[in-house]
């Protein structure tokens, strides 16, 4: 059975979007995963298929209605253990471990919010997992949903050409990835580091690890602290 993604959205034509190309697109064609977008307007209320209303307590914007979202979720095929994820700036920041966890299961359902967000009650009723792509606010949940799905799909067996590709990437061992180089060996007066041309695989591995440490320390001190903490545990 393939890994299944169902997306609840006001803009179903955004899917699979970029996921129809490259690694994810080829995996989609091969049946490694499947993707179906469901139009929330189909469950909207009244002549205008309304999916939102004004917030209780006042305030700007509109809030997506719990009853509409509940109906949409209930209309989905059996979840079969698939978690429902809601991308939101209020959520816990997503990690590589989240992508590994989600990709190891039967699939995922993604609820894409719009406006000022969704009624809290539907999140509580369906025990929806709230994840954040970063400390930034976007216009809706569709782009974060694409990001989440891409992060998961590329980890599915048979998607990447080499299992080593995934093992060496940023976050796979808790560190950011080392710098990469390709031909030509000299470009614009800049040389590829000699160690990478040496053929000494042990020395190259050590250099790459040192570079990963340096990059992580400089750019993501939070990741570096977490990495050190894990090393102390083990």
Swiss-Prot record:
It is found in: Cytoplasm. It catalyses: guanosine(37) in tRNA + S-adenosyl-L-methionine = N(1)-methylguanosine(37) in tRNA + S-adenosyl-L-homocysteine + H(+). It holds the Pfam family tRNA_m1G_MT. S-adenosyl-L-methionine binds at residue 113. It is an enzyme of class 2 (transferase). GO terms for molecular function: tRNA (guanine(37)-N1)-methyltransferase activity. Keywords: Cytoplasm, Methyltransferase, S-adenosyl-L-methionine, Transferase, tRNA processing. GO terms for cellular component: cytosol. Its EC number is 2.1.1.228. Gene3D superfamilies: 3.40.1280.10, tRNA(m1g37)methyltransferase, domain 2 (1.10.1270.20). GO terms for biological process: tRNA N1-guanine methylation. Belongs to the RNA methyltransferase TrmD family. Homodimer. Specifically methylates guanosine-37 in various tRNAs. NCBIfam families: PRK00026.1, trmD. This is tRNA (guanine-N(1)-)-methyltransferase. The lineage of its organism: Bacteria, Pseudomonadati, Pseudomonadota, Alphaproteobacteria, Acetobacterales. The gene is trmD.
